């Protein structure tokens, strides 16, 4: 019982480190590229997913020359912490619940319940094949060696070019007896649950709010099932795929229902295009969904923003997809695998 409690506490500490790293990394991108008028809670949640995407790109580039080691973790952590320190005042103002209302208490209580639920679930036994041990050898190869040409000839699954294994390998280097893939699956689920809960509290009560409440209630139900399902404690890409897909659905819904101004529409488009490209690198079967998300976000732009968006796609899509394609070619030893 004590061992289980300590493992749950350690999982929460690992989650805090990951959340700080990704949110801070996303903040740099947010400040330099997206340039919102202010940092809000919603912006901070967006920054986490942006930071995840940027970290996946970095890990692919790093893996061309080095194994996924403690130095890779340190660089991402340093990037995140430095951004959090540089923007400390704005972040403090964004996360402070002022004025504190009764509904905030309900949200915090619900969130803590889900934290305990997910931490308990990720301690479960790892299952067989695609939902469990399937990915563990891949993670270990990435931890020990840089990308190995033709590794897929040793075993077919080693050629599967899915970036979550780089993410899990990175987390294995955080000082912990908790396997990295467990911490990785848990933090993605927890952040998304928190984002849904706090967005419901922060939204204005109007027709759009009612639609948003229904839609996010559906997403929350799916996430609860996901947190208790097969992939919560598995070394496979499905949990990351599901969480990022839900986040994209959330941003598209926000774009269509809340009718933001043109500047905010363009900001959402940049986020959707970056994360949609990352979704393809997680699992190529998500390509159609990713394309639909990008087209929907682009269609809602007008005039000059549409022209700018085409330029941003030409610049950013290769940044995400080219390292992934090259990584896959090297791993498999074939141009097409």
Each language-model region and where it sits:
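Membrane-embedded, hydrophobic transmembrane alpha-helices
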Residues: 1-98
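Specific aromatic-rich, kink-prone transmembrane helix
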Residues: 21-22, 26-29, 240-260, 268, ...
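Membrane-interface alpha helices of multi-pass inner-membrane proteins
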Residues: 60-63, 268-284, 288-295, 333
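Multi-pass, polyprenyl lipid-linked donor-dependent membrane glycosyltransferases
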Residues: 184-188, 208, 215, 227-254
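Membrane-interfacial entry segments at the cytosolic side of transmembrane helices
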Residues: 68-74, 96-108, 208-212, 264-267, ...
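Membrane-lumen/periplasm interface segments of specific transmembrane helices
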Residues: 123-126, 167, 311-337
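Perimembrane helix-loop-helix junctions
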Residues: 83-85, 89-91, 102, 289-318
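Active-site lumenal/periplasmic loops and adjacent helix-entry segments of GT-C-fold
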Residues: 116-213, 232-234
């Amino acid at each position: 019982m004590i061992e289980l409690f300590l493992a749950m506490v350690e999982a929460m500490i690992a989650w805090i480190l990951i959340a700080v790293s990704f949110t801070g990394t996303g903040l740099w991108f947010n400040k330099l590229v997206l340039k919102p008028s202010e940092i809000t809670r919603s912006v901070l949640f967006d920054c986490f997913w942006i930071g995840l995407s940027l970290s996946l790109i970095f890990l692919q580039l790093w893996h061309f020359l080095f194994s996924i080691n403690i130095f890779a973790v340190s660089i991402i952590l340093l990037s995140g912490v430095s951004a959090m320190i540089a923007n400390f005042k704005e972040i403090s103002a964004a996360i402070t619940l002022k004025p504190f209302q009764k509904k905030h208490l309900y949200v915090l209580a619900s969130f803590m319940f889900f934290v305990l639920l997910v931490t308990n679930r990720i301690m479960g036994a790892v299952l067989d094949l695609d939902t469990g041990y399937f990915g563990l050898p891949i993670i270990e190869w990435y931890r020990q060696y840089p990308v190995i040409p033709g590794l897929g000839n040793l075993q077919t699954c080693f050629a599967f070019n899915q970036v979550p294994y780089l993410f899990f390998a990175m987390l294995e280097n955080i000082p912990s007896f908790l396997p990295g893939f467990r911490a990785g699956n848990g933090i993605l689920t927890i952040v998304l649950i928190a984002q849904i809960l706090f967005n419901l509290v922060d939204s204005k009560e109007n027709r759009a709010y009612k639609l948003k409440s229904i839609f996010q209630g559906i997403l929350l139900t799916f996430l609860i099932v996901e947190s208790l399902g097969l992939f919560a404690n598995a070394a496979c890409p499905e949990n990351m795929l599901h969480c990022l897909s839900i986040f994209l659905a959330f941003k598209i819904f926000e774009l269509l229902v809340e009718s933001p101004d043109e500047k905010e529409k363009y900001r959402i488009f940049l986020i959707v295009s970056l994360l949609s490209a990352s979704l393809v690198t997680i699992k190529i079967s998500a390509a159609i969904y990713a394309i639909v998300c990008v087209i929907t976000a682009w269609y809602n732009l007008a005039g000059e923003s549409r022209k700018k968006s085409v330029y941003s796609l030409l610049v950013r899509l290769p940044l995400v997809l080219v390292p992934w394609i090259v990584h896959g070619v090297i791993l498999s030893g074939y141009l097409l695998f």
